[in-house]
């Protein structure tokens, strides 16, 4: 039977942990108390810290025998990230903690499938929680008061968390979707293209559009790695620009990694590779002084990529595409890669585009399964969307 994992550091938060578990039970859930503390627990638990720590590559001693708190927390986080996904009876996870506990518990939560309920009551939840949530669906709930014993506020917060996780865990199972899901990447400057693709595919596909802001690409690839996507139309690969040239919305070095690992049908393009993103104009690094900038809005500044930068981007993407052995089509719109890169537009630069296209074509090892095709179109032309859809249907239904 599926159970709700109630997770905390029983060495420092034992009283709160037991109370949270009792609230889960009162709400109709089956709680399992899991200790991820690094010292002796103050309460009885169902799964001990030693059990969790034992799955660390260095064994339990690597987690529990040291004297440095920071090292122990990092090691327990690594152990919990291995322990939790291996359990087959998890209906949901609710955690509670301060800085150390939040780091440990969310490390495990991030490894769970999207859709499996996850609630983290944390003293850090009202701040920047990006490092803890990343591209997962963890629900962060502020503890309001510190986790230093039960009081009239903490009791209410923990009870709410217990009722939330129990309600989510006990909801009726949804029917399996009949349409295959596909991931698409979009930016404001490629919206006409992606919208047109969705219109053409939505009748027989569940179209999941991701904003190409760094986290968007990672979220899409996480779904691909999780087996939740049937294919990808990666129209907007702009996150690579920010990775290579220090923008604020970067991909990681693992961009395209899920495509290589899964062999999913993949149609890609060069959407918004004409720009690097920064915040307000004064945040643009000094090394880019004198560059062509475009004020997208008061808080976002775009920098046009040069021919040399475009060539580097093309080589980077091309090398990644060479690692993909699944069916792949990469489409090059010769008349512009974004709404700004069009004749008369702020970023229109045929020389930069040519450098990008030539670097891609030179780098990619082409085969029957891995093809690059030039089209005499702008990326936002309706005919380009039609070509992308045709390419996807060709490789998804060979």
Swiss-Prot record:
Pfam families (alphabetical): UPF0261, UPF0261_C
UniProt-listed InterPro entries: Tobamovirus_resist_UPF0261, UPF0261, UPF0261_C, UPF0261_N
Keywords noted in UniProt: Plasmid
Key word Hydrolase present: no
Family classification: Belongs to the UPF0261 family.
Protein name: UPF0261 protein RA0729
Native source organism of the sequence: Rhizobium meliloti (strain 1021)
